[in-house]
Regions:
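C-terminal capping/lid segments that line or modulate ligand- or cofactor-binding pockets
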Residues: 455, 463, 637-662, 714, ...
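Alpha-helical positions within canonical tetratricopeptide repeat
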Residues: 336, 340, 406-409, 413, ...
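Short coil/turn linking the two alpha-helices of tandem helical-hairpin repeats
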Residues: 318-325, 393, 397-400, 587-594, ...
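Replace the tail clause
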Residues: 1-578, 582, 630, 688-698, ...
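Acidic, turn-prone loop/beta-hairpin segments
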Residues: 680-731
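Extended, leucine-rich alpha-helical cores of fungal transcription factors
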Residues: 569-576, 580, 585, 600, ...
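Long hydrophobic segments that form regular secondary structure
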Residues: 575-584, 734-752, 759-764
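Phosphate-binding active sites in nucleotide-utilizing proteins
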Residues: 568-617
């Protein structure tokens, strides 16, 4: 449907963007001859811009553009069908730099808008509001190009089948300083629109046929669970070439084979019939080790993502049962795994991704050494990183058999992230991202540097010239270190050496093709206080004071003079749940150890209030269903997805272990778990008393695991199962873990009571194993892409451990139960374990405080720590 020539031209047009880290999609294959002539279409009734009717800040920001944006609903689809026009779908998010650039260059261009409005039905989608839609078309883009990114621009038939797609295309007249190999001029956004208009007018039948064929293949891969793993690359565009990194996942395309194994025809879903075994953890570790950057930390080259699931997997290897360590290669290999994770966390802590003046981490780096970030801050990323840094901090103390201290490495990052997410009253707590008790989705990459500026710039809030930096740090105030000992200029030089601030800026020229970062500096730590002591002859303690005061001055100037990046005010269930989990775990450590009871209590209260508000605002008591997000004092009309349930259940289990409140947290977690199963689970057999009709069978594969969307969801052409970890843990990895944890907790609570049983609609343990089995064929070939599910393989094979504590007078009292609770809180995550709070009707002689109940897997857990 698209010529090879157009493929090359579209890719060349986006080459400049790709050099900054945004993926570029190759249009669908199947060559046809395309000319430059533009076919005039019959006039249709003028469309009206409906962006203002949206519940998304990203979409609402487009209500003043000349493009007549439609929302993804039955009316827009019906319009495309009645007028027989291609749908142009833009998928983006508010914090994204290239999404804003596309809007500025193309969607505000009158010629682009005129062609979109007359020849297409333009539909705009917020990927954070509808990640299910984004996932479908991102899979298509990745299938034909092995890379993706945002904005995601796709042309669809009126039946929503993809015809052509890409990411960022330069606006009309914007120079790309790039050309294709055979000398063809690169196409800009307007040129691509003209080509698509021409092709649809002259070759509609062929476009439809090939789009239908592609959807059929994608549907087959989705049914097999192989979507996104590699088979689509072969089927739709041939084997992948090069080392393209997918900016939506951080996965290098070159690591994916073009062959995918066939599922055994006789595969059985029985709980004990798992083909995937502990050996896959060794294979995953070996692959991750091969991609580790031993110079700069992280994995692969660039762009580089923090990838919390991968870091968590590496850290967990040291805290899994010894059987796992033996399979991985023994203590030496486990130590290497820990080293890779810690080296990466140090690089993140010191590098350009961290906001050294405020708090939090940016989304990813466009350079291998973490020096130049894309500046958007995502709440989900920071919540997940808090959990990983917490495990890294606790792991050092656990290795030495002691309680953690605030002097241990990474404690400072844990405190910073915890306050950023859960303590707006702190010096660095960000009130801008907290809307009431819930967190907004993100802070944007672009902003105005000064209130009088007319144009936004990428990273404007975070960048410093050497002149401005020196003037700020060298300024003197009463009580300032600069009053007395040394002059302010020396202190500015010390701080500049620490953060690598240079006269002509520290951003490489190749990362600034449009001269936007001339003389600008990204702060990153390149010297230790000890090295500064040697260079400047200033005591280490005084160096630390200088840096602390410099940070305080820079933050004050930034807050007063600069304009904070826009905040996406959506409060998404899944992202808030990630923060609840991390705050509950981190707060429990600070409170139970006494390291900072006030701060720990604040974090836990923040997490509990967020959970209460989700229940009050976004949970329907009658139906038991969640809504996806809260925005401007009302819940969205978009139903929650499987990931919202998964992460919220996990958060409630973490809150239960932090507080011991069974009625508030454990009971609701079980209620949500049953609802998630009812809405999203692909039952291997019909649940008791139910039957699956022939129509329903068309959207189910009967292989276990959770679909991302409910059955019959409108405008969803594929039901996908999310099993592969990306920058976030997969829905099915989190869900399998939740099912095992619930089974462990409830089984042990029931065994401790005098005949009291908790009513259960489902066998959680069996469903967890079925969920693993749903992905085991892919896990056998690509285990490194399924690190989250691999941890549940350990649970399935070796079981888990439940530790009992008695709330007694409350978890704040120092008694035997609180010692147990403290020891539990201070253990980094490893395998399956749970803290069970004794019920009032527990049989005292049957369960003692601190005695662990064990549930077994295929092999019983005998020794080792979970």
């Amino acid at each position: 449907m698209m010529s090879v020539q157009l493929q090359k031209q579209a890719n060349a047009a986006a080459a400049a963007a790709a050099s900054r880290g945004d993926g570029v999609a190759i249009p669908a294959a199947s060559p046809t001859q395309v000319t430059d002539a533009i076919t005039q279409v019959a006039e249709s009734p003028a469309l009206q811009n409906r962006a203002g009717d949206s519940e998304s800040p990203y979409i609402q920001a487009h209500q003043d553009t000349p493009v007549a944006w439609q929302l993804l609903d039955k009316d827009a689809v019906a319009l495309a069908k009645s007028q027989n026009k291609l749908i142009f779908m833009n998928i983006g998010f508010k914090a994204c730099h290239y999404c804003r650039l596309t809007t500025q260059e193309s969607f505000r261009n009158k010629n682009v808008a005129a062609l979109l409005n007359s020849s297409f039905i333009p539909i705009i989608v917020d990927r954070e509001e509808r990640p299910d839609i984004d996932s479908i078309y991102m899979n298509y883009i990745q299938a034909v190009n092995s890379a993706g990114g945002w904005p995601l621009n796709v042309f669809l038939t009126p039946e929503l089948e993809p015809v052509f797609g890409g990411t960022y295309w330069p606006g009309p007249g914007r120079s790309t300083s790039s050309a294709v190999e055979d000398g063809e001029e690169p196409l800009d956004f307007l040129g691509i629109l003209k080509k698509l208009q021409k092709v649809w007018t002259e070759q509609e039948a062929k476009c439809r046929k090939e789009a239908q064929d592609i959807v059929l293949q994608l549907r087959e891969f989705a049914a097999e669970g192989t979507m996104g793993v590699g088979s689509t690359e072969k089927a739709l565009s041939g084997a992948a070439t090069g080392t393209t990194v997918n900016v939506s996942t951080g996965v290098p395309a070159s690591t994916l084979s073009a062959e995918t194994p066939t599922k055994p025809a006789t595969s059985s879903p029985l709980a004990t019939d798992l083909d995937v075994d502990l050996d896959q953890l060794e294979e995953a570790y070996a692959n991750i080790s091969r991609t580790f950057d031993r110079v700069s930390g992280g994995f692969n080259l660039s762009p580089k993502f923090p990838t919390p699931p991968k870091l968590s997997f590496l850290l967990r290897l040291a805290h899994l049962p010894p059987e796992v360590g033996d399979i991985v290669g023994g203590p030496e290999e486990v130590e290497k795994a820990t080293h890779m994770a810690l080296a990466t966390l140090r690089a993140l802590r010191d590098g350009g991704l961290r906001d050294h003046i405020g708090a939090g981490f940016h989304r990813y780096s466009v350079t291998a050494d973490w020096s130049v970030p894309h500046f958007e801050k995502m709440i989900a990323d920071n919540a997940l990183l808090l959990g990983v840094y917490l495990d890294a901090w606790l792991g050092q103390a656990a290795k030495e058999g002691r309680t953690p201290t605030l002097d241990d490495e990474f404690a400072d990052v844990v405190l910073e992230l915890g306050d950023y997410l859960g303590n707006t009253g702190s010096e660095i707590g960000s009130s801008s991202i907290r809307q009431g008790s819930l967190l907004a989705t993100s802070e944007a990459s672009d902003s105005y540097q000064r209130k009088s500026d007319k144009h936004m710039r990428e990273g404007a809030f975070y960048l410093w010239t050497r002149r401005e930096f020196d003037a700020t740090v060298s300024s003197t105030e009463e009580g300032d270190l600069t009053n007395g000992k040394h002059d302010g200029e020396l202190y500015a030089r010390v701080a500049a050496a620490y953060w690598n601030v240079k006269e002509h800026g520290n951003i490489p020229e190749e990362q600034d093709p449009n001269d936007e970062f001339i003389n600008q500096n990204v702060l990153r730590v390149v010297k230790t206080p000890a090295e500064l002591n040697t260079s400047f002859g200033i005591a280490v303690d005084e160096v630390n004071q200088i840096l602390a005061q410099a940070k305080k001055k820079l933050r004050a100037r930034r807050d007063i003079e600069r304009v904070r990046p826009d905040v996406d005010e959506k409060q998404v269930v899944a992202y808030n749940a990630m923060a609840i989990s991390a705050l509950a775990r981190a707060g429990a450590v600070l409170r139970s150890t006494g390291l900072d009871k006030t701060r720990g209590g604040t974090w836990i209260k923040s997490a509990e209030q967020a959970a209460r508000d989700i229940k009050a605002k976004l949970f329907d008591q009658e139906t038991g269903k969640l809504s996806r997000h809260w925005f401007r004092n009302q819940k969205s009309s978009t139903d929650a997805l499987a990931e919202d349930y998964a992460f919220l259940i996990e958060a409630l289990l973490d809150l239960y272990e932090a507080t011991g409140d069974e009625s508030a947290h454990l009971d609701w977690a079980q209620q949500l778990q049953d609802k998630q199963i009812g809405l999203f689970y692909d039952h291997v057999a019909a649940p008791s008393g139910q039957s699956i009709d022939s129509e329903a069978a068309k959207t189910r594969s009967g292989s276990g695991g959770f679909y991302s969307t409910v059955e019959g969801a409108p405008n969803v052409i594929l039901r996908l199962k999310d099993g592969m970890d990306t920058s976030q843990p997969s829905t099915n990895a989190v869900s399998a873990s939740n099912l095992f944890r619930l089974a462990l907790i409830l089984n042990n609570l029931e065994s401790s009571t005098n005949g009291t049983k908790t009513a259960r609609q489902y066998d959680y343990d069996t469903l967890a194993r079925e969920t693993i089995k749903a992905f085991e064929v892919e896990m056998l070939q690509y285990p490194f892409l399924f690190t989250g599910l691999l941890i549940s393989v350990v649970s399935a094979r070796l079981g888990g451990q439940a530790t009992f504590a008695d709330v007694g007078q409350g978890l704040g009292v120092e008694d035997a139960s609180n010692i147990i609770a403290r020891e539990f809180a201070c253990k980094p995550r490893g395998g399956l374990r749970a803290l069970c709070i004794k019920r009032k009707d527990a049989v005292s002689e049957g369960v003692n405080v601190g005695v662990s109940g064990i549930i077994g897997g295929v092999e019983q857990l005998k020794t080792g720590e979970h």
